Amino acid sequence: LEASPLLLNSEIIELIGQGMWLFTGSDGNVRVETDINSFTEFSAVKPRGFSKNRVIRVIDSIGNDIKDIFESMYIGKVDNSEQGRNLFKKEVLQYFETMQNINAIQNFDPDSDVIVEQGDELDQVICDCYIQPVDSMEKLYMSVTLSI
């Protein structure tokens, strides 16, 4: 198998920097060069990790899954009291433990990474989550010391 057109390494780097998703050939195999999306405007608020599809899939899953948990088990069913919010927090903590066990997130601290509080209105719940997604190995920087 071959990827076409054949690109120089400098061209590959340039295209990836532009947010291009591309295929390259190596040892008769075609592979995705890197699992990125088109996001290229990095900042302190949205660093380079936001250009990585694996990271975005984790972030999207967290938002969707916690929304589903809240809607299916808590809306209209559980009081917005300290006890009710603690039940929800326990559910979120279990979810993140599972996410860490499947290597979707890392360095999760159940004592500090989830805060659930009442919002400004009686029916509002605020859930702040501090997570670190796991990404794939893609780059190797290696030093070799020769002894002659």
Feature names for model-found ranges:
Residues L1-I148:
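Structured, hydrophobic secondary-structure cores that serve as assembly/anchoring elements
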